[in-house]
Amino acid sequence: MKLNYDFFLNKFNNVYNNDIRLVDLSNKWWYHNCRVHFAGNQKHSFHIVTRSPWPLYSSIAALMFTFGLVMHMHNYFYGNLLSLAGFFLILLMMFVWWRDVIRESTFSGYHTKKVQQGLRLGVILFIISEVMFFFSFFWAFFHASLSPSVVLGSVWPPLGINVLNPLKIPLLNTLILLLSGLTVTWSHHVIRDKSWQKFFFSNSNNEEFKAPLLDNYVICAFALFLTVFLGLEFTVWQGYEYYKASFYIYDGVYGSTFYMTTGLHGLHVIIGTLFLIVCFFRLIDLHFIYNHHFGYEAAIWYWHFVDVVWIFLFLSIYCWGSGVDSFFK
């Protein structure tokens, strides 16, 4: 089987050994198979952002979306079309912007170790901001459930709400997400195997010697495929649960907090699944290596964050917030 080794030249010229050209690759068996010409090779290790039109265009798209949404809420003409156009422009800007980031990392060698440290800090701060986002919804739920008002009948769950059984679909979704966390960790463990270093620095052109790399990529891709499948399965079951539920988002504070919190988490699951799908295709195209795969690592961090949030959500809203009687329905 013939492999695509185009990315190897960039990885070892710009990433390995502090990402400066200190490694002579001319005698490596895969060097002469590279077909991509790398014009950009930075000689420093810092994150110098190049000129890009996407921040400006993304801001315009966000303005169109929010302005159109406000117009639609006030029944102004063409408000829905403006918000829809802004939404699709946001998706387009996300695609082209992240496409350029992938090019800078994989093909231009701009994501040095120093740059990756900054990116890691950025992802950590982003996840912390997401934690605060979910914290506000959990605060609303516990504010209403710990001291239910007279309007709710002074009980929780409120009178007239037929809550869901936590031991049915919610428990199944919990097991699905926990299993997906296991499979994505398995995939991450395989790609971080440092025994690949012997393969990369060998001059052998023997197909049997190349087999371990192919095997590791197959195992890594298979584990990642399982994770994506489990994420899609979780989304399907969550949608089925919404379809079968007897209460709606407008059924008081219970319905609003339930659907807002679980729906927000479901949106994050969809985003995380798309993130992992992109990583899956990048993995197949050999964009990742044992010491240079931060894009995949960021997706794994995000997926584990989604797992942890669901555990808190399952224990608080589904189990504790539904009352003891819900276990026997």
UniProtKB/Swiss-Prot annotation:
Its main location: mitochondrion. The chain crosses the membrane at residues 53-73, 77-97, 122-142, 169-191, 217-237, 269-289, 298-318. SUPFAM superfamilies: Cytochrome c oxidase subunit III-like. Keywords: Membrane, Mitochondrion, Mitochondrion inner membrane, Translocase, Transmembrane, Transmembrane helix. It is an enzyme of class 7 (translocase). One of its GO terms (cellular component) is mitochondrial inner membrane. It is found in: Mitochondrion inner membrane. GO terms for biological process: mitochondrial electron transport, cytochrome c to oxygen. Pfam families: COX3. One of its GO terms (molecular function) is cytochrome-c oxidase activity. InterPro entries: Cyt_c/ubiquinol_Oxase_su3 (IPR024791), Cyt_c_oxase_su3_dom (IPR033945), Cyt_c_oxidase-like_su3 (IPR000298), Cyt_c_oxidase_su3-like_sf (IPR035973), Cyt_c_oxidase_su3_a-hlx (IPR013833). Coiled coil: none annotated. It catalyses: 4 Fe(II)-[cytochrome c] + O2 + 8 H(+)(in) = 4 Fe(III)-[cytochrome c] + 2 H2O + 4 H(+)(out). It comes from the Eukaryota. The keyword Mitochondrion applies. Its EC number is 7.1.1.9. Component of the cytochrome c oxidase, the last enzyme in the mitochondrial electron transport chain which drives oxidative phosphorylation. The respiratory chain contains 3 multisubunit complexes succinate dehydrogenase (complex II, CII), ubiquinol-cytochrome c oxidoreductase (cytochrome b-c1 complex, complex III, CIII) and cytochrome c oxidase (complex IV, CIV), that cooperate to transfer electrons derived from NADH and succinate to molecular oxygen, creating an electrochemical gradient over the inner membrane that drives transmembrane transport and the ATP synthase. Belongs to the cytochrome c oxidase subunit 3 family. Component of the cytochrome c oxidase (complex IV, CIV), a multisubunit enzyme composed of a catalytic core of 3 subunits and several supernumerary subunits. The complex exists as a monomer or a dimer and forms supercomplexes (SCs) in the inner mitochondrial membrane with ubiquinol-cytochrome c oxidoreductase (cytochrome b-c1 complex, complex III, CIII). This is Cytochrome c oxidase subunit 3. The gene is COX3.
